[in-house]
């Protein structure tokens, strides 16, 4: 559910930014201005998003907003995956029973239900 909301938010941001570029490009009637705008847009397309999270400083001194937004979304998604505590959250470890019979063979995150049910029941043969 939470990942669906995040993906919808991400798609909404991408679509609104692309619509904003189309509207601003159609307002200029001068073809020289339109050619200059197209060349600037081509330069933006070849710019990579930095992994450090800092915004990119362009030649004209402006900050690339797409790179800044991409870094912000990447940081947000990493925090959402880690959980609210900042550590990898594992459900059910607080209620772990110390008398559990097969605790040395349990793996974090999954459980073999067939083996567990076979060991819990003692069959009289």
UniProtKB/Swiss-Prot annotation:
This is Cholecystokinin-8. Residues 1-20 form the signal peptide. Belongs to the gastrin/cholecystokinin family. The modification Phenylalanine amide is found at residue 113. Its main location: secreted. Transmembrane segments: none annotated. One of its GO terms (biological process) is digestion. Residues 21-105, 114-125 form a propeptide. InterPro entries: CCK-like, Gastrin/CCK, Gastrin/cholecystokinin_CS. The modification Sulfotyrosine is found at residue 107. It holds the Pfam family Gastrin. It comes from Python molurus. Keywords: Amidation, Cleavage on pair of basic residues, Hormone, Hypotensive agent, Secreted, Signal, Sulfation. The keyword Zinc does not apply. Hypotensive neuropeptide that binds cholecystokinin receptors (CCKAR). One of its GO terms (molecular function) is neuropeptide hormone activity. It is found in: Secreted. GO terms for cellular component: axon; extracellular space. Coiled coil: none annotated.
């Amino acid at each position: 559910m939470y990942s669906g909301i995040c993906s919808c938010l991400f798609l909404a941001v991408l679509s609104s930014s692309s619509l904003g570029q189309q509207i601003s490009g159609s307002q200029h009637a001068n073809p020289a201005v339109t050619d200059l705008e197209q060349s600037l847009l081509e330069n933006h397309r070849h710019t990579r998003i930095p992994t450090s999270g800092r915004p990119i400083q362009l030649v004209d001194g402006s900050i690339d907003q797409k790179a800044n937004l991409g870094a912000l979304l990447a940081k947000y998604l990493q925090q959402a995956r880690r959980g609210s505590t900042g550590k990898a959250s594992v459900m059910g470890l607080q209620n772990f029973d110390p008398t559990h019979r097969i605790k040395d063979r349990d793996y974090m995150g999954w459980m073999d239900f067939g083996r567990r049910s076979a060991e819990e029941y003692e069959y009289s043969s």
